[in-house]
Amino acid sequence: MVSRRAFLAGSAGLAALPTLATLAACGESGTTFERMRASGVARIGIAGERPYGYLNGDGAVTGEAPTVARAVLADLGVGGIEAVQVPFARLLTGLLDGQYDLVAAGTTITPSRCARVAFSRPDFLAPLAFLVPEGNPQGLRTLGGASRSRTRLGVLEGSAEQDYALAAGVSPTAITTYDGQSTLYRAVANGEVPAAVLTRLSLLDEQSRNPGSRLQVTPGFAPSTTPTGEPVYPVGAFAFRPADTDLVVAFDTALTDLQTSGRWLETVRPFGFDDENLPPAGLTTAQLCTS
């Protein structure tokens, strides 16, 4: 996540990085990157969360993160991807257990996750929002407000939103966890919980597929890490095993090229992203892992 001050400050530009050709030639024998380049296929972990990473009606993997990953990996000489879908809460565990080579699911960078895995450079910014009944009867605008009103909230199990809610003072007993985006949506629709919190992009995508639900998505907001703290912007990225340093460096270089060339926006627009979701050029993963 990134503070509002850091977000507005941005940066003068991206640091110089090695060329893709140089990086591709440096893979050590036996590394994940070497195996991917030899086979031409990367295995990616997804959680079925729209619009980040999911399977379409034909069973093909799609979403913002797999599509960006496909473009980045193609620039690295890896032309194919195979998806493994697991529950959201098991994404990082599956990565560390070797089920796939990287996570392409719009995973939010947080210090606790940085202690387990290596993240790519920031891929996108994603403000949060509430899913509430029409008219927003609780008047929810922020997680601090939800805490003060003692509103019960639905969240995805193991999500950054769960951590944000707890940090904002929401009682653990007021939080109900769900294992999937659609299940979370139905919980509000069925009155199991009066509200849910998730990225606004996810909620708008779910809302578009549930016309007539009599629910609404609130305006986006930046959560705080404490009840009175400075707002922070959730930032999504790709996750890797810590030992796969050559893959992370190569992936970052290609992702940087994709973002600075304008191809990133062309790639993500079909999934509801726009230039407001593009991270500031100078925002680094190191900053996010310590904030």
Language-model segment annotations:
Residues 1-18:
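N-terminal secretory signal peptides and thylakoid transit peptides that target proteins
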Residues 27, 63-75, 136, 144, ...:
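Extended ligand-binding regions for polar small-molecule ligands
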Residues 32-106, 115:
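Extracytoplasmic small-molecule ligand-binding "clamshell" domains
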Residues 33-35, 121, 133-152:
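Flexible hinge/capping segments at coil-to-helix
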Residues 41-48, 52, 143-161:
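Short loop->beta-strand "edge-of-pocket" segments that line small-molecule binding or catalytic clefts
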Residues 83-93, 176-186, 190:
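Short helix-initiation/N-cap motifs at beta->coil->alpha
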Residues 106-115, 166-167, 194-232:
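A ligand-binding cleft/hinge motif common to bilobed small-molecule-binding domains
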Residues 125-131, 211-252, 275-291:
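Periplasmic-binding protein-like
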